[in-house]
Amino acid sequence: MAKSKELKVPTGKSVMYLILKPIVQFAYRKKPKIINLAGDLEKKAIIVSNHSAMSGPPSLELYYPVKTVKWGAHEMFGNHKARTAYMRDILYIKKKHMKPGWKTSLKAWLLAWLNPFIYKGMKNVPTYTDARLGKTLKVSIKALEQDLSVLIFPENSNDGYFDVLTQFFPGFVMLAERWYALKGEDIPVYPIYISVSKHILVIDKPMYVQDYVKKGLNRYQIAEVFKDKVNDLYFKYVKDAEVYDYKAEKKALKKAKKSK
């Protein structure tokens, strides 16, 4: 039986991504308003975020204040045929509710070619729903040891992407527990909410998994606590907020300075 390949901490070094990055930057050129409730952010931390459809990960890659390694669907690390099928059938049709047809198939086929370069540049590692999750946890520990934060999107998006999250999977809880078992340190976990449509990013104060372990909560219950906190950020700071316009605010500040 062939030995399974060990995952390495991604460096983000990719010549193709350097070529593609200006396109990504143009697509997400509208800088979000960052509401930082946490103050100075730890470099070594876990971050749990909503996905904001396909837009959250690239937007956070560009605008989150700390360097991160990200968890991504393992299907996106397969061959071109597997990536195309996943993007067409799961991502576009099932989750984004796009109509099946040649346009959706062509879009999936084209983006499946670009995906490996983008994933590599964004420092993504594959995550799994089976025993192979151990590989993801192992490489995530190595990333934390290198003072990189680990950004995880734990929402259950099987029925699509929604503003209000219905469930968090507990993989991030397992990572925090593993770090605590190895290092004796209760690593900070930052709940955040990203709205690409309104151009708002909210970063909450860190929470700590061991606080809830001591209360007798299991992994799934702890994951629900964090899910509720992320939803709370949406209701408090995003739901009724107007679309943020960075350029308009910049002009207004410039005008205010001149008038003084």
What role is predicted for each listed range?
Residues K5-K21:
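Short, charged N-terminal beta->alpha structural module
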